[in-house]
């Protein structure tokens, strides 16, 4: 058995032992995934899902949140901890995505971590769940 065959067997065993676990947050696209992960800081996923289920059917793109403005975002996420700080991050994150990334969520750690409110853990979750890159998000 050559190294390539051994590698395939090892990968098969690892994939079976450590399957991809879906994130418990509900989202519609990579942008709403990013927002949900940002909202989940110091908050339960259940609470985030309860709040976002009323938001995402209508507001699910960066331009939607820029049009809403910070105060309206605050009122929509009021039930989530530190909502004023998170609303500010979501507003400026959305604005930055439009101005620097054509409204798209970037798919590199470097670009994600430059976005307002996005740290390495948030970037890791988005890279893994949103783009399928191997990542190990750590809180």
Q: What is each of the regions a protein language model found here?
A:
Residues 2-139:
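Catalytic cores of DNA base-excision repair glycosylases
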């Amino acid at each position: 058995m050559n190294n390539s065959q051994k590698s395939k067997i090892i990968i098969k065993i690892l994939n079976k032992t450590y399957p991809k676990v879906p994130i418990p947050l509900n989202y519609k696209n990579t942008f709403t995934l990013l927002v949900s992960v940002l909202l989940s800081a110091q908050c339960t996923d259940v609470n985030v899902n309860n709040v976002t289920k009323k938001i995402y059917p209508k507001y699910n793109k960066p331009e939607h949140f820029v049009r809403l403005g910070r105060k309206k975002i605050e009122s929509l996420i009021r039930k989530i901890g530190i909502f004023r700080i998170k609303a500010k991050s979501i507003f400026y994150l959305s604005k930055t995505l439009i101005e620097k990334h054509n409204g798209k969520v970037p798919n590199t750690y470097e670009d994600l971590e430059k976005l307002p409110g996005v740290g390495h853990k948030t970037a890791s979750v988005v890279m893994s769940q949103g783009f399928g890159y191997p990542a190990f998000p750590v809180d």
